[in-house]
């Protein structure tokens, strides 16, 4: 845990920040840089609440610098563009996802995989090129290089589309990369939560046969009837799990806490792939023999590059994919964090920044 010293920039900004490991978010005055020639400035309209926001404000991963303004599922309207910006114009709706910077010259960046760059700059909690701390979308305004700005499809809702900037790309990308996007592919989705319910929608749009695997029997009806999954497995029911052995081509595991992996490997066909997208606080135990039997693959992914994220947004708009959301006011965010940990949301919180961020607040500098 570290403390950052705020550098005064020309543009005043207002948001909600956590200041220590309690994770309590409160009003926070700060500043953002002036609009550079390749920069896009936007008024934030909506920002999704991601499980990683909770991890970061509590320093669960051990690298948080305070104060920290979370939020990397950001939708807004462009208010100013730099003199050399060509991608968008004032008045356009746009998105900012998990990244606001990378080296732009390494092999990963040149291959449109900015998220794999060793010098990636996260939307919040990272050091920007000018040495200042990045702050996220729990704020009234954002500025970013146009390369990291995403054009918002006209028919994609702003509020329920916002979580796609993390949950959408985090599930779309592995389905594409690991070859699990072919019609008829049998896909398992572990955990019917913020990531999981989007994974189901993405996989179904690709034409997959989807099995939801969850610890809660109460999720069965929603998985099958509302989200359109083809089957449901209660992973605490050994008979159900045994009956489904060697039935899946791939599994997208969205659970962000430690859990046994061996039962999931048993569900895979030979050459099957288990892809981890949840980020737990502690390392998993790896059941090596489960991998050896059947030449199975354990993989992982972390969001995606800018080109692929734009592709995902366009795909979502074409197939009418959005997140199931509960829109909340800014001052409800601490309660939302408490509910998030209890899985008491169906399935994603989205903060109505534009209508509920009271910038006249004088608290917390």
Curated annotation (Swiss-Prot):
Lineage per the UniProt record: Eukaryota, Viridiplantae, Streptophyta, Embryophyta, Tracheophyta
Keywords: Cytoplasm, Metal-binding, NAD, Oxidoreductase, Zinc
Protein name: Mannitol dehydrogenase
Highest taxon of source: Eukaryota
Primary location recorded for the protein, binned into one broad class: cytoplasm
Encoding gene per record: MTD
Enzyme's top EC category: oxidoreductase
Organism, as annotated: Apium graveolens
EC numbers on record: 1.1.1.255
Similarity field: Belongs to the zinc-containing alcohol dehydrogenase family.
């Amino acid at each position: 845990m570290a403390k950052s010293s705020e550098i005064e920039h020309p543009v005043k900004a207002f948001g909600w920040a956590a200041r220590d490991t309690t994770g309590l978010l409160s009003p926070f005055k700060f500043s953002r840089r002036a609009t550079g020639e390749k920069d896009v400035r936007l008024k934030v309209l909506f920002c999704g609440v991601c499980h990683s926001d909770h991890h970061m404000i509590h320093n669960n991963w051990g690298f948080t610098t305070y104060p920290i303004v979370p939020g990397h599922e950001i939708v807004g309207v462009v208010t100013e563009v730099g003199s050399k910006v060509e991608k968008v114009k004032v008045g356009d709706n746009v998105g900012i996802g998990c990244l606001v910077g990378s080296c732009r010259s390494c092999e990963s960046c040149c291959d449109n995989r900015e998220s794999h760059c060793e010098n990636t700059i996260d939307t919040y909690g990272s050091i920007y090129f000018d040495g200042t701390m990045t702050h996220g979308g729990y704020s009234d305004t954002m500025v970013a290089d146009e390369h990291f700005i995403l054009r918002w499809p006209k028919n994609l809702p702003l509020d329920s589309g916002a979580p796609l900037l993390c949950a959408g790309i985090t599930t779309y990308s592995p389905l594409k990369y690991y070859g699990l996007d072919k019609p008829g592919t049998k896909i398992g989705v572990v955990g019917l939560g913020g990531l999981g319910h989007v994974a189901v929608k993405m996989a179904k749009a690709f034409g997959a046969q989807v099995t939801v695997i969850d610890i809660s029997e109460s999720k069965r009806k929603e998985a099958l009837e509302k989200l359109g999954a083809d089957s449901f497995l209660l992973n605490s029911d050994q008979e159900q799990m045994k009956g489904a052995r060697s039935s899946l081509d791939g599994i997208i595991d969205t659970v962000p806490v430690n859990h046994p992996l061996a039962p999931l490997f048993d569900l895979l066909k030979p050459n099957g792939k288990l892809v981890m997208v949840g980020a737990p606080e502690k390392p998993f135990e790896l059941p090596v023999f489960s991998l050896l039997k059947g030449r199975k693959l354990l993989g992982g992914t972390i969001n995606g590059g800018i080109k692929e994220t734009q592709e995902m947004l366009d795909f979502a708009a074409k197939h009418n994919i959005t997140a199931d959301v509960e829109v909340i006011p800014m001052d409800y965010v601490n309660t939302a964090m408490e509910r998030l940990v209890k899985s008491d949301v169906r399935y994603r919180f989205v903060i109505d920044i534009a209508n509920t961020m009271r910038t006249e607040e004088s608290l917390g500098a």
